[in-house]
Amino acid sequence: MAPPEPLTALSRWYLYAIHGYFCEVMFTAAWDFVVNYNWKFPGVTSVWALFIYGTSILIVEKMYLYLKDKCNILIRCLIYTLWTYIWEFSTGLILRQFNACPWDYSQFDFDFMGLITLEYAIPWFCASFIMEQLVIRNTLRLRFDEHAEPGSPVMSTVSMANGHVKCN
């Protein structure tokens, strides 16, 4: 029997899109709590966030695979943060042409055209670290086994050792 296949790019894009969407909602809820002491935690985002995050993280995945043996994690996270600013500015500028940009940072002190702001540099850097270490690395480890029965574990051919899948 053939070994399980890695997830397709579309499947990984989907997971990255959902992850980004969720993080956006959680960040806006936390931000509103810190700024306005709003105990309701009303996290919000736009459906555009699915495309924006899914595509961006898939591109960062390619960067990770290229850079992981070439530079340390701090440099990689700096590169990912710069990419995030470029991507956020570009997608925001395109969406603004259709009056569809869901964010406006013009009230921030260090914004550029209301599309990006330096106040988010540290959160973006930290998010880059989490994205690489938890999301991308683990997503790349996921496998699709088309022969598995729905709901049944495959422990007869695979065992767990120290959190890693090990073929018998």
From Swiss-Prot:
The chain crosses the membrane at residues 15-35, 41-61, 73-93, 110-130. It is a multi-pass membrane protein. It comes from the Eukaryota. Its main location: membrane. The keyword Signal does not apply. The keyword DNA-binding does not apply. It is found in: Membrane. InterPro entries: CmpB_TMEM229. Residues 1-14, 62-72, 131-168 are cytoplasmic. GO terms for cellular component: membrane. It holds the Pfam family ABC_trans_CmpB. Keywords: Membrane, Transmembrane, Transmembrane helix. Residues 36-40, 94-109 are extracellular. Belongs to the TMEM229 family. This is Transmembrane protein 229b. It comes from Xenopus tropicalis.
